[in-house]
């Protein structure tokens, strides 16, 4: 340390066959939940002397594939994808990837996955809203193409309402993008109908 010597990362990579780099692909860098996830990833990687290369995709599945391909061709030891949805192109990449991939937030048989109980969360939310509501209930969600945050949460929400003797009536459901602005627009649409 006194001499200022720093070992060459390229020499270490040649010697150990490891880059000690993990590519992390996230849908939105400025999302609170994604910030927490990336902070947790960085903490664990740092404890193991790994570094993170971070790429944001602005909720665009095609960009997820683009960045995973970039990282696959860069000397990374693995990729972590916080996925928006798993498309046929995602499955193809995951089946053929030369580096290990972990998917967070979605389920696929082609990678190790860490995902939440979106159905259970939606159901708990449906029960809680039904217990406090005296009027009509509305739901704003993302596209059902997103099997986790879209389909599973909506199905769980509807089940929670049903268990509480309520239902989501026609016209009280809106599909939004995964942004606060889009959610706000859908609230205004509901209020103006």
Model-predicted regions and their roles:
Residues 11, 65-68, 91, 126, ...:
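Short hydrophobic/charged patches on amphipathic alpha-helices used for structural packing
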Residues 65, 72, 130, 191-192:
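Non-catalytic positions within long, well-ordered alpha-helices that form the structural scaffold/packing
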């Amino acid at each position: 340390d006194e001499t200022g010597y720093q070992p060459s990362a390229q020499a270490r990579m040649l010697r150990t066959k490891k880059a000690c780099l993990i590519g992390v692909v996230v849908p939105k860098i400025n999302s609170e939940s994604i910030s927490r996830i990336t902070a947790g990833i960085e903490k664990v990687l740092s404890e193991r002397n790994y570094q993170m290369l971070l790429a944001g995709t602005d909720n665009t599945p095609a960009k997820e594939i683009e960045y995973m391909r970039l990282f696959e061709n860069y000397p990374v030891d693995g990729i972590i994808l916080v996925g928006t949805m798993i498309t046929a192109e995602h499955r193809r990449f995951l089946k053929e990837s030369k580096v290990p991939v972990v998917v967070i937030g979605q389920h696929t048989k082609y990678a190790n996955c860490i995902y939440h109980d979106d159905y259970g969360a939606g159901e708990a939310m449906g029960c809680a809203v039904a217990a406090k509501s005296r009027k009509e209930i509305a739901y704003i969600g993302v596209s059902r193409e997103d099997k986790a945050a879209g389909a599973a949460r909506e199905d769980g929400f509807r089940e929670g309402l049903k268990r509480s003797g309520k239902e989501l009536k026609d016209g009280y459901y809106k599909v939004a993008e995964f942004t606060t602005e889009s959610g706000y627009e859908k609230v205004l649409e509901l209020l103006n109908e």
